[in-house]
C-alpha cells in the first residue's frame, strides 16, 4: 500500500477517534428541600475548610449519574431516537424514580456524596440495568467502568492533591452533614461529559410516563409494583 494512501487512512481514523466523546444519563435532583440541605452541608464544610470551596458541586445541578456512553456525529441521531423511545421501554421498570436520601457518606476519602435509601438504590439500579440492556440493542457503546453500580449524588469531589482528611472532618462534625429528604423524579437527561460553562451541555431528555400512556403497553402488567410507593414526608428522619 502506498505511503500516501496509508497516511490518508491513518488521518481518517484519527479524525474519527478524536470526534468521539462521552455522554452520561442522569436524573436531576431539584427538590427545594434537598437543595437547601446540600447547600447547608457545603456551607458548613467550606466555612471551616476554605480549601474545599472549589470542589463543591453547584447546587443548581445536583444529579445522580446513571450510564455513560460513547457518542459521535453518526451516533447522535441514534441516541436521540433512543431517548424518544425510552419512556415506553422504561414504563414497566419505573416511571417515577425515587431519590430518597438517608444521610451522607465519604468514598475513598475524596468524594462526599448523598446516600440514597435501599428502596431508592434498588429502583435506580433497575433503571441503570434497563438502560444498559437497551443500549446493547443499538450501535451506541456503553463505557461504564464499574462492575457493580452504586447510585449516589456527589456533593464534593476532591482532586489528587493532598487535602485535609475529609472522612475525619465528617466523623467529627456529623451534625453538619445531614441529608434526610428526597423526591420522585420523572425525567432522565443525557449530558455531554465534557463540562461546558457551569455544568454540561444537555443532549436530550426522556420524560417518563406510566404504561397506560402507551397504547401497545396499555394492558401490560408492570413488573415492579413495589416501585410505586408514596414519597416519605419531608420532615421524616432517615437517620
Swiss-Prot record:
Q: Which residues are glycosylated?
A: 44, 58, 72, 92, 109, 136, 172, 192, 213
- This protein's GO CC annotations: extracellular region
The signal peptide, as residue positions, is 1-19
Concerning Gene3D superfamilies, the annotation shows: Cyclic phosphodiesterase
UniProt xrefs under Pfam families: AKAP7_NLS
Places the protein is found: Secreted
What keywords would UniProt list here? Glycoprotein, Secreted, Signal
InterPro entries in UniProt: AKAP7-like_phosphoesterase
Instruction: Spell out the protein name for this chain.
Output: Uncharacterized protein C35A5.6
Amino acid at each position: 500500500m502506498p505511503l500516501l494512501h496509508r497516511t490518508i487512512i491513518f488521518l481518517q481514523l484519527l479524525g474519527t477517534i478524536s470526534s468521539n466523546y462521552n455522554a452520561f444519563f442522569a436524573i436531576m435532583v431539584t427538590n427545594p428541600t434537598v437543595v437547601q440541605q446540600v447547600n447547608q452541608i457545603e456551607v458548613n464544610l467550606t466555612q471551616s475548610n476554605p480549601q474545599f470551596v472549589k470542589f463543591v458541586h453547584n447546587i443548581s445541578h445536583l444529579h445522580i449519574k446513571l450510564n455513560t456512553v460513547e457518542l459521535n456525529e453518526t451516533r447522535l441521531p441514534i441516541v436521540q431516537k433512543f431517548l424518544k423511545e425510552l419512556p415506553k421501554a422504561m414504563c414497566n421498570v419505573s416511571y417515577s424514580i425515587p431519590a430518597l436520601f438517608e444521610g451522607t457518606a465519604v468514598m475513598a476519602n475524596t468524594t462526599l456524596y448523598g446516600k440514597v435509601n435501599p428502596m431508592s438504590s434498588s429502583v435506580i439500579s433497575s433503571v441503570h440495568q434497563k438502560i444498559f440492556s437497551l443500549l446493547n440493542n443499538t450501535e451506541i457503546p456503553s463505557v461504564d467502568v464499574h462492575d457493580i453500580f452504586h447510585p449516589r449524588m456527589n456533593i464534593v469531589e476532591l482532586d489528587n492533591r493532598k487535602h485535609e482528611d475529609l472522612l475525619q472532618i465528617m466523623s467529627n462534625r456529623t451534625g453538619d452533614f445531614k441529608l434526610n429528604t428526597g423526591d420522585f423524579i420523572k425525567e432522565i437527561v443525557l449530558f455531554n461529559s465534557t463540562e461546558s460553562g457551569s455544568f454540561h451541555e444537555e443532549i436530550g431528555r426522556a420524560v417518563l410516563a406510566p404504561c397506560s400512556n402507551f397504547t401497545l403497553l396499555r394492558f401490560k402488567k408492570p413488573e415492579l409494583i413495589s416501585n410505586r410507593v408514596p414519597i416519605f414526608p419531608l420532615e421524616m428522619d432517615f437517620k
